[in-house]
Structure formats: C-alpha cells, structure tokens
C-alpha cells in the first residue's frame, strides 16, 4: 500500500463521542451513565491538557487508555473503587475542555456513537485491543481497489478512481474530461493515469509550482515529470542556442512606463491609472482565444465608455502590448506573467511537440483559452481533471460535447460532516453541477462555530472574502499580538499602503512612497469612489473606521512588523485563491459568509463557490461563523440589491 493511503502508526481512536464530552462540560452528572471505556477515554482527554510533549504522541495516549482499562478489569483496587469512582473524583471540566482543544491539533480521534456502542475495541475480557486500529482500517478504508499499472506499480484506488482508470485503459486514444469535487485525490489519480500511458510520452501540466510538486510526489520519488503552465509556454518560446534574457535588476515603475509610451490619460484618469486600466484590458485579452485587441476586452466602467474613449484605451493598450513584447522582463510587474507567456506562444502558432502522445492538465477549471489553443493544434489526446466549483468567477473550461466526460463525487479528504455543509451550496448554485457531494466515512473533520472576537489557533489558515477582509483580520489579529502572513505578502502590503495613501491623499498623495499604486485602485480617483464601490462590504466599513480613527503609514509599519511566514503564524488568504490547496485548520470569516444582500444572482453564485472552496480545504478542523445550511436558507429568502431585465 502507498503511504498516503494509511499509516498504521497514525491515528488513535478514543471510545467516546464528542457529544458526550460536550455534555459533560455542561453537567458532570453524565458520568454516571458512561461505560468503563468511555470513562477511561475521558480521563485520557483530561490528562492531555497537562501532558508533556512526548505524551501527546497518539501511541502513548493509547497505552494510558489500555492501562486504565486493564486496571479496571484486573485491579488491584479496593472494593467499591473503579473507573466510575475515580472518574468522578478526578473530573475537571476545565481540563476536559483544554484536552478537547489539544485533540484538534493531534492524531487522536473520537469515535462515533455507533462504533462506541459496538465495543469492537475491547478483547473478550474487557481490556483494550491494541489491534483495533489495524482491524478497523479495512472496513473504513476508501482505497479498497488494487490496480497494477503499466510500470508494474501497485496502486490502491477508490471505487470511483478505479472505474475511471478502467475507462482510460479501454479507450487510451480518446479525449477525456473528469469533473471531480474537492478532495477526490485528483493529483494521485493523475499519477495513476500517467502510469497507464506510454512512458516518456505524457506531458503533465499544472497551474502552479505547488500543484506540480504534489503531482510529482504522486508519480514517484524524485520524479521530474511535468511542467507548470509558465514553464511549458517558456519552453515553446525559447530559441535553441539563444541565451535567456537577463532580468533587469531595477525595472521602471508604471508612471515611468506611461510617460515612455506617451500614455497621457483619459477622462479624469492620469497616465499611471490609465496604464493600470490597460493592464486589465490586456489580462482579459490574454485569457481569451482572440487574436487581436477589441472592445470585448475592455473592463467594466460604471459610466459607459464613448466610442472615442474605447478607441483611446485600445490604442494605449496596443502600445503597452508592444512594450511588453520588447521588454519581457516587465511581465512580472503586470500581475499575470503566465498568461502573457501563453498568449505569446499561442499567437506565434506553437503546438505541443510531437514527441508527446498525451497531454494531462490538472486543475483544468483554471485553464486559459490560449493554452487550449496550443493543445488543440497538436494531435495529442487531451485528458483534463478539474472542479467547476473551484472556479468562483465563471464557468471555467468547457470541453466539446463529443469528449467523454466522467464525474467523481466521492471525496477522500472531506468526511460526512463537511458533506453536510457542501451539499446545500451545490443545491443553491444557479448553474453548475447538481451531483451530490459525498465524503469518506472514515474522515473526521471537526466543525466549530466561533464567537465574535475569536482568535484562531496557531497555524490556522483564515480564508477571507476580499482584500478589505484580509486587511481587517490582519489588524485585529495584530492587536491580539498574533503573527500573520499572506499568500501574497508584497501584494497585500502594497494594497494596505495604497489604501492609507488614498484615504489621506492630502497628507501622502498616491504613490508618494515611490512605489506603484495597487491595481485594485486602478479605477479610483478618490476615496469617495472607493466608498461608493464598497459601501455594502462590512469589512471595508470596519477598515474605514480605523482609518478615520488615525491609522496611518506609521501604524501600518508597526503592523508590518508582525508579518511572518513561520509555520505557527496565521495565514490570511482570499478564499477564491485557495483552490487546489489543503490545510489542517481553516477558518471562514464572517464577511465570507456575509448576511447583507448580494448585488445579484451572479455575485451570490460566486460567493457560493468561494465558500465551497473554503469548506473543502480543511483536513482536520473547520471554524465557522454560523451554520452553512442556515446561511443558505437565509439568502434564499433575501432579495438581491439589483435585478436584471430580459
């Protein structure tokens, strides 16, 4: 068996339910009705609150449990003395509470009510069976199907994964698309698919280096197979024998580029802001399959553009495109360097090299149009694996109807508790798949509803609704002496600095620190416009109140001192950017599950996807502001702020 399937030295089970423990926190008289195994488990949990680090090892906790049950059955102890009397004497609700907190970060797991009642963890004489973990495993292991791949590798798959592998083996020369929900093991499945295809002739593509590393681990130790989207495009564009262009140590800022290109501005926007708007236009162009810049790529404006304004913007964007062609080192200043590389490769007519027979794309919901064009020019078989719910801002990749499609709904990362949270979201989305999500019964992800002013535990990932939400949580957590980090530290610090400067434009002036204003504020001429755009965002209103109370660059610098990338820091990340990743502990912010009416059905659909992404990231524990089912029901009864005609 592969190590990712099961580690017999991993999880240890305690024979008591979470509900029983929570009941004891309210009323200790519940001890009277508990069995000896349950009482022993309660004592073990209490001991965790004061145990030393080495005793927190699951195996050590299991030994304590076994000794308690052995003492209960075999003694020696005085008449009338047993686990019941000792549990009542030693019971401490405070220790039990903190012991339960320790379990959240350990490899100890509480059993469900049915398994506690079955008592299969006991030997015939009533003592603890140390083989319980290994005996329990076959009954709950989702990886029950053995497969021997083309390289004589043993793979253990779920039933759904095994069915898909059989389809591929029976039809190796047919295109295939797999729509798989979060946690189905797409990267592992992709590794199994590659094993069944011709060695050295499969091109595996992943969107990010992190996803590529995960894929390589599944393929095999030391594997260098596969490329990121950017690496693939760069390889197509590189000319043999020509040295790679050296990156300039210092690149010109946006203001300098605007002056170089004679971008004077339009409407009330100056040259720098106009360049930011041109970058939005170019990003839309790079995501499309179009060959030339057109009005279809113009970003949305609250006040519609005149024909002259549109022509001016297209001319400026054309100049910027030419500049980027001549100065590729400036790509990294745009915020979308990978899209630029793919667009250049597509426009140049490149295709997948003929030495490859198959192309496999992981996380294909984020697959841009130019990459699809490059692949379609070749004659390779294309296999895509994606999850449409992990694309919050649109439908994502759509394969042709004639392409064989398969759905996988069984998640090996998410358990029944997460299943009950996600299915209401799937049911309420207006367009996407309605196939019911199914979590593995052997997985126990803890669910906790947190109060206001809650401080997450160390190492928790806080998934937010917007940059304002991230800024709010960073300020709140710093006030509580927590160390925080961001998925994009530089970008988030630039956002906060730009917000402070724009709020106090009379004191600082936009870009007064010599750096470019964050692209989020490309359309903002003044703070009043930012207010208008975000007046329904509670996190923005909270941040604005802090700015009004005197939060300035000096306070921002003090806040920055608490930024850290250490493992025990709290990572803040927009939920829609967390797709394809997984974390032990995840918190969803109140603004992510906002109660204010949404702008329209499209905005609500996007938020449903963002909440889906957030819920499905957790391996061990989820912290929620309130119940997901109630949140969905609440918004079903709400009207949107805007309604669209037909």
Model-derived regions: residue spans:
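The feature marks helicase ATPase cores and/or their adjacent C-terminal helical subdomains
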Residues: 1-646
């Amino acid at each position: 068996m592969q190590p990712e399937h099961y580690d017999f030295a991993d999880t240890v089970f305690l024979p008591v339910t979470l509900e029983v423990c929570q009941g004891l926190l309210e009323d200790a008289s519940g001890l009277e009705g508990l069995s000896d195994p349950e009482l022993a488990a309660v004592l073990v949990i209490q001991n965790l609150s004061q145990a030393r680090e080495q005793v927190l090892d699951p195996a050590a906790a299991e030994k304590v449990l076994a000794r308690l049950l052995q003492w209960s059955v075999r003694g020696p102890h005085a008449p009338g003395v047993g686990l019941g009397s000792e549990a009542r004497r030693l019971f401490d609700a405070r220790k039990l509470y903190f012991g339960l907190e320790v379990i959240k970060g350990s490899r100890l797991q509480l059993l469900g009510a049915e398994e506690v009642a079955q008592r299969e963890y006991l030997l015939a004489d009533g003592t603890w069976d140390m083989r319980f973990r290994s005996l329990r495993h076959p009954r709950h292991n989702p990886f029950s199907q053995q497969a021997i791949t083309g390289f004589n590798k043993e793979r253990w798959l779920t039933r759904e994964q095994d069915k898909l592998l059989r389809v591929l083996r029976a039809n190796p020369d047919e295109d295939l698309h797999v729509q798989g929900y979060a946690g189905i093991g797409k990267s592992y499945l992709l590794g199994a698919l590659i094993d069944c295809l011709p060695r050295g002739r499969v091109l595996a593509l992943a969107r990010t280096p992190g996803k590529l590393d995960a894929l390589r681990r599944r393929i095999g130790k030391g594997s260098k197979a596969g490329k990121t989207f950017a690496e693939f495009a760069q390889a197509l564009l590189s000319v043999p024998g020509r040295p790679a262009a050296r990156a300039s140590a210092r690149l010109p800022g946006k203001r300098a580029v605007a002056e170089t290109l004679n971008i004077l501005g339009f409407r009330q926007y100056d040259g720098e802001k106009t360049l930011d708007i041109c970058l939005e236009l170019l990003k839309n162009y790079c995501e499309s399959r179009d060959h030339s810049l057109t009005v279809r790529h113009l970003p949305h404006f609250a006040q519609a553009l005149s024909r002259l304004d549109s022509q001016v913007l297209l001319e400026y964007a054309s100049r910027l495109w030419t500049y980027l062609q001549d100065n590729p080192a400036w790509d990294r200043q745009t915020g979308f360097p990978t899209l630029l590389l793919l667009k250049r490769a597509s426009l140049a007519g490149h295709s997948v090299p003929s030495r490859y027979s198959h192309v496999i794309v992981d996380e294909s919901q984020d697959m841009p149009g130019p990459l699809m064009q490059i692949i379609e020019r070749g004659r390779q078989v294309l296999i895509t694996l994606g999850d449409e719910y992990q694309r919050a801002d649109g439908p994502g990749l759509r394969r042709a109807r004639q392409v064989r499609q398969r759905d996988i709904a069984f998640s090996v990362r998410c358990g029944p508790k997460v299943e009950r949270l996600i299915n209401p979201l799937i049911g309420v989305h207006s367009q996407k798949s309605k196939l019911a999500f199914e979590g593995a019964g052997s997985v126990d992800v803890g669910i906790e509803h947190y109060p206001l002013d809650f401080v997450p535990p160390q190492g928790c990932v806080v998934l937010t609704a917007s940059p304002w939400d991230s800024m709010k949580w960073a300020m709140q957590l710093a006030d509580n002496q927590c160390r925080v980090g961001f998925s994009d530290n530089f970008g988030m610090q630039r956002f906060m600095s730009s917000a402070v400067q724009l709020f106090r434009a009379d004191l600082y002036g936009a870009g007064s620190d010599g750096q470019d204003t964050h692209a989020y504020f490309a359309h903002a001429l003044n703070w009043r416009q930012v207010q208008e755009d975000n007046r329904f965002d509670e996190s923005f209103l909270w941040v604005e109140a802090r700015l009004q109370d005197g939060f300035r660059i000096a306070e921002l610098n003090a806040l920055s001192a608490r930024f850290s990338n250490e493992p025990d820091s709290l990572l803040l990340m927009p939920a829609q950017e967390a797709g394809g990743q997984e974390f032990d502990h995840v918190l969803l912010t109140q603004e992510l599950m906002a109660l204010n009416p949404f702008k329209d059905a499209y905005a609500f659909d996007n938020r449903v996807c963002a909440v889906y992404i957030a819920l499905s990231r957790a391996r061990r524990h989820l912290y929620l502001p309130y119940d997901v089912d109630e949140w969905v029901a609440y918004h079903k009864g709400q009207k949107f702020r805007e309604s669209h005609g037909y």
